[in-house]
């Protein structure tokens, strides 16, 4: 791991906007991007495809260590593309059912350990923007800037509904809200690396903020710390 490259971590619950913010921020800075949540979603999706039970920690650990994954950076007018075993899965892994599976496998210590070094390997020059749930508390505890981004469950469900509407059949706002609340409980109550802000994190509630307003706050913190040079 390159200890020189700076890291900005953006943690928060599902639907808080951290992925969107992290992607735009990484592109603006010209830095690398780690979407750690995608790794857990990919593992849950791969487990389903291979018939691996989400409670089988040993098999999940082996699957995590050998995931055939490719991240293709976003370009103008296009979102980041994610390839699993040769197939593009960028949209399908964003469904709440896959997200629920990701939350289950993320609670398993052996799985988290298997993916830890894989995540840390993303820390390369000129810098890294890492988004997830334990980026600032576990994966990059020495990051010079840590953001914890949240929003009300209702607002997060609304955002996810707009994101999935037209892409996923049968999606409803009420079911998304129920799933988000259930996932919040799992993520905050798990024994290993529970979702919580780092002690030195800047906490931002984005319920009433636009993406641009959130980015403006973060860019101000970057300037104060002179992180990007």
From Swiss-Prot:
It catalyses: CMP + ATP = CDP + ADP; dCMP + ATP = dCDP + ADP. Its EC number is 2.7.4.25. It holds the Pfam family Cytidylate_kin. CDD domains: CMPK. GO terms for molecular function: ATP binding; CMP kinase activity; dCMP kinase activity. It comes from the Bacteria. ATP binds at residues 12-20. One of its GO terms (biological process) is nucleobase-containing small molecule interconversion. Keywords: ATP-binding, Cytoplasm, Kinase, Nucleotide-binding, Transferase. It is found in: Cytoplasm. InterPro entries: Cytidylate_kin, Cytidylate_kinase_dom, P-loop_NTPase. Its main location: cytoplasm. GO terms for cellular component: cytosol. Belongs to the cytidylate kinase family. Type 1 subfamily. This is Cytidylate kinase. It comes from Pseudomonas fluorescens (strain Pf0-1).
